[in-house]
Each structure stands twice: as structure tokens, then as C-alpha cells.
Amino acid sequence: MYWSILAVGIGGALGSLFRWFLGIRLNGLFSGLPLGTFAANVIAGYVIGVAVAGFARAPQIAPEWRLFVITGLMGGLSTFSTFSAEVVQRLQDGRLGWAAGEIVIHVGASLVMTILGIATVSLLSR
């Protein structure tokens, strides 16, 4: 149990720090879309696809690694709450079309990247 707590905690701390770094480096580049939030979600989508498929193919890997990568690292990196706050800000600003576009872009890209992550493992496993 303690190893699981450490795995999630350390992974979450590292993922959150990486998300913070992406926000600092990318959010100021384009005022219409916070690119740091977008990058965090898209990267997390891809890595979680790779991780889910990889761990499914290697069940002998200790469950703490799954907790570290998926629950901790990618949980800390991906940011549904920040994404939600940014969309609500667009709605409050009366930018309904922009808010809808942001939803489609974030969710669509994250799903596509997760599928690509799973496909990557499938292709590399042949």
C-alpha cells in the first residue's frame, strides 16, 4: 500500500510540475487558446494510450508502475479542471463559438492522441 501511495504521489508531483512548465512556456504564445493546457492534455492523451496498451501487453509489470504513470504522472499532467475554467471564462466573455471550438479541439485531440498511443504500441509490438 505504501508503494502505491508513493507511486501516485511522486508521479502526480512530476506530472503537475511538467504541466506548470508547459503553462509558463506556452500559454502566452497565443491569447485565444492557452497552448500549455492544450499541450498538457494532448501529451497526456498520447502517453496514457501508450501506457494502457503497454501495461495490457505486459501484465507482469508491478502495478505500482501503472499507478505511477497513469494515475500519478498523467493524472498530474492532464488538466480537465483548468480546461473547464478556461472554457467557462470564454462563456463569461460572451465568446460562445470560441468556447465550443475549444471544447472540440481539446476533447477531439486528446481522444485522437490516445488512439494513436494505443496504435503505436500495437505497431511496435508486431
Curated annotation (Swiss-Prot):
<feature type="transmembrane region" description="Helical">
    <location>
        <begin position="103"/>
        <end position="123"/>
    </location>
</feature>
<feature type="transmembrane region" description="Helical">
    <location>
        <begin position="35"/>
        <end position="55"/>
    </location>
</feature>
<comment type="similarity">
    <text>Belongs to the fluoride channel Fluc/FEX (TC 1.A.43) family.</text>
</comment>
<keyword id="KW-1003">Cell membrane</keyword>
<dbReference type="Pfam" id="PF02537">
    <property type="entry name" value="CRCB"/>
</dbReference>
<feature type="transmembrane region" description="Helical">
    <location>
        <begin position="68"/>
        <end position="88"/>
    </location>
</feature>
<keyword id="KW-0406">Ion transport</keyword>
<keyword id="KW-0813">Transport</keyword>
<keyword id="KW-1133">Transmembrane helix</keyword>
<dbReference type="GO" id="GO:0046872">
    <property type="term" value="F:metal ion binding"/>
</dbReference>
<keyword id="KW-0915">Sodium</keyword>
<comment type="function">
    <text>Fluoride-specific ion channel. Important for reducing fluoride concentration in the cell, thus reducing its toxicity.</text>
</comment>
<feature type="binding site">
    <location>
        <position position="78"/>
    </location>
    <ligand>
        <name>Na(+)</name>
    </ligand>
</feature>
<dbReference type="InterPro" id="IPR003691">
    <property type="entry name" value="FluC"/>
</dbReference>
<feature type="binding site">
    <location>
        <position position="75"/>
    </location>
    <ligand>
        <name>Na(+)</name>
    </ligand>
</feature>
<dbReference type="GO" id="GO:0005886">
    <property type="term" value="C:plasma membrane"/>
</dbReference>
<keyword id="KW-0407">Ion channel</keyword>
<keyword id="KW-0812">Transmembrane</keyword>
<feature type="transmembrane region" description="Helical">
    <location>
        <begin position="4"/>
        <end position="24"/>
    </location>
</feature>
<keyword id="KW-0479">Metal-binding</keyword>
<dbReference type="GO" id="GO:0062054">
    <property type="term" value="F:fluoride channel activity"/>
</dbReference>
<keyword id="KW-0472">Membrane</keyword>
<keyword id="KW-0997">Cell inner membrane</keyword>
<dbReference type="GO" id="GO:0140114">
    <property type="term" value="P:cellular detoxification of fluoride"/>
</dbReference>
<protein>
    <recommendedName>
        <fullName>Fluoride-specific ion channel FluC</fullName>
    </recommendedName>
</protein>
